[in-house]
From Swiss-Prot:
PANTHER family: CUTICLE PROTEIN, CUTICULAR PROTEIN 47EF, ISOFORM C-RELATED
Coiled coil: none
Name of the protein in its database record: Cuticle protein AMP1B
Keyword Nucleotide-binding: no
Domain Chitin-binding type R&R positions: 16-81
Pfam families: Chitin_bind_4
Organism this protein belongs to: Homarus americanus (American lobster)
Stretches for region Disordered: 1-21
Length: 105
């Protein structure tokens, strides 16, 4: 959108790995994130972004990125179906066996 105006553009960097960033335009694009030093030497990020889809609905994603990887969350992301009952039962049995100290190589 050529006519979009920047409404917000705020940046703060402490220089020690801590930072905050926020950006918003008049056409509905928005992003914000914060960062902190991570326990494994990485930079931990937490944030969100949103934009308007062609049908007028708002797409929004929140996320965490840390030593466990990128972990997005959104109603737009596909969700796998639940495991069938027999698989759920097998997982319960495995958890019970681990609690009893049983291990499998």
């Amino acid at each position: 959108d050529r006519d979009a105006q920047t409404l917000t553009d705020e940046r703060s960097d402490q220089g020690d790995g801590n930072f905050r960033y926020e950006f918003e335009t008049s056409n509905g694009i928005y992003t914000q994130k914060t960062g902190t030093p991570g326990s494994e030497g990485q930079s931990n990020h937490q944030g969100s972004f949103r934009f308007t889809l062609e049908d007028g609905t708002i797409a929004e994603v929140t996320y965490i990125a840390d030593e466990y990887g990128y972990q997005p969350s959104s109603d737009l992301l596909p969700v796998p179906p639940p495991a069938p009952p027999h698989v759920q039962r097998l997982l319960e049995i495995a958890a019970e066996q681990r609690a009893q100290g049983i291990t499998f190589d």
